[in-house]
Amino acid sequence: MREVLLSECIDLLYESHFVISKPFGRSCFDLIAKKADLRFLIKILKNIDSLSTEQSEELLNIAKMLQAVPIIIGTRTRNSVMEEGAVYERYGIKAVTFNTFRDQLFGEPPVVYANRGGFFVNIDGAVLRETREKLKISVGELAEISRVSRKTIYKYEQNEANPSAEVAIKIEEYLDVPLIKGINIVDYMEGLKSQKSREEAFEKILKESEDFKIRVIDILGDMGFNLLETTKAPFDAVAEESKEDDSENQNIIFTNIQETENEEIRRKAMIVDEISKMLNSHSLLVLEKKTNENKRITSMSISELEKIGDTVDLLEFIEKKKKSTK
């Protein structure tokens, strides 16, 4: 079932003119998709409740650094089948069905979100209040037909609470005015509003790192990079040069860190290189000692890394390596 869903998502994204990565296994995300300024980090799950806290934190951190929208596409929760046209949320990440995701891409956003107690909608509180006052309808009258308290109506008008879909429809019909607003599941900032700081997540994971990786991370940090270490992604760290212009990811390096190079490491590094090209950024494999030169992979030993002065020097080194392989 998961493989079918993954295949359907790939077909949909191609149909919608996205550039997409190859699927990843054992990662906090399965696909990266990009079209113009819109970027998705997509996790495919049959049961959206199977997402772990560790996976979600890493997915959110990577999404924030890449200015991408993290999203889960699934078919069910622990207790029931997911409703079409409804938005669920797990650890601050929006989760929808394939059909709901497709509708959003085609310009039809969902309007219902799942929460404790049922399904709710976002409404325009200002329009509610203006219309009620214009029609000279009291708060008490509206509360009575809606079967909620006066206090709840006040909260709706102040956008401090949202009604259930059933209550919202009753109010719309009584006032004869549209109030329900769509939910934009592709909004970057909205998708990351519950994001923890990168620094907290980095410090937490760093304590669990291997010694060699710590050495490399320390060197990159001393150069002046902002760093995010990962354990559930195809790369080991993301190094970002501090910059004022956030329009592109030119100064981001997806970094793989391994003491010994082998076929599996080379395969992973080539996948990461594809990601970097898709996102107009860079990739780097740092090893204890370099072995065979692979023209498709930008690599260096830790001793070479230690000789690099700062972020500018490292980025120039990578650019020269890339040009020499063309």
Swiss-Prot record:
One of its GO terms (molecular function) is DNA binding. PROSITE patterns: HTH_CROC1. Coiled coil: none annotated. It holds the Pfam family HTH_3. Residues 128-183 form the HTH cro/C1-type domain. Keywords: DNA-binding, Transcription, Transcription regulation. Transmembrane segments: none annotated. The keyword Transcription regulation applies. HAMAP family: HTH_type_cro_C1 (MF_00584). This is Putative HTH-type transcriptional regulatory protein MmarC5_0898. It comes from Methanococcus maripaludis (strain C5 / ATCC BAA-1333).
